[in-house]
Curated annotation (Swiss-Prot):
Lineage of the organism: Bacteria, Bacillati, Bacillota, Bacilli, Bacillales
GO process terms (BP): spermidine biosynthetic process
Summary of subunit composition and partner proteins: Heterotetramer of two alpha and two beta chains arranged as a dimer of alpha/beta heterodimers.
Pathway: Amine and polyamine biosynthesis; S-adenosylmethioninamine biosynthesis; S-adenosylmethioninamine from S-adenosyl-L-methionine: step 1/1
Record flagged with keyword Transferase: no
GO cellular component: cytosol
Domain of life: Bacteria
Native organism: Halalkalibacterium halodurans (strain ATCC BAA-125 / DSM 18197 / FERM 7344 / JCM 9153 / C-125)
Ranges annotated as spanning the membrane: none
Post-translational modification: Is synthesized initially as an inactive proenzyme. Formation of the active enzyme involves a self-maturation process in which the active site pyruvoyl group is generated from an internal serine residue via an autocatalytic post-translational modification. Two non-identical subunits are generated from the proenzyme in this reaction, and the pyruvate is formed at the N-terminus of the alpha chain, which is derived from the carboxyl end of the proenzyme.
Keyword Lyase attached: yes
Protein name: S-adenosylmethionine decarboxylase proenzyme 1
Length: 105
């Protein structure tokens, strides 16, 4: 789980760019994308999911707070999750990043 603070509000409100970043992050992890869906909220904010064969990546943004909450979840320990996390944090250029790791199962 990632919490990104102090991000650019314009980027956090750009559904197409967020979709591109999240799908590319799945590819960087060497995951197989099954489908994706993103939604833009008025007046601002984006939520989205990239369903991968191995589980999912999700994002919820609050541009008015410069904040994004992101989950990178997988049931395949062979995926390159750290590559996905690094890519996401670089693309959003957050001033403050908090990572939480949760082992399930």
């Amino acid at each position: 789980m990632l919490e990104l603070h102090d991000c650019d509000a314009t980027l956090l409100n750009d559904m197409q760019q967020i979709k591109t970043i999240m799908c590319e992050a799945a590819c960087k992890a060497k995951a197989m994308i099954v489908t994706e869906h993103f939604h833009y909220f008025l007046p601002f904010g984006v939520s989205g999911v990239v369903i991968i064969q191995e589980s999912h990546l999700t994002i919820h943004t609050w541009p008015e707070h410069g904040y994004a909450a992101i989950d990178v979840f997988t049931c395949n320990s062979k995926l390159a999750l750290q590559a996905a996390v690094q890519y996401i944090t670089q693309q959003f250029n957050a001033g403050n990043v908090t990572q939480h790791y949760l082992h399930r199962g």
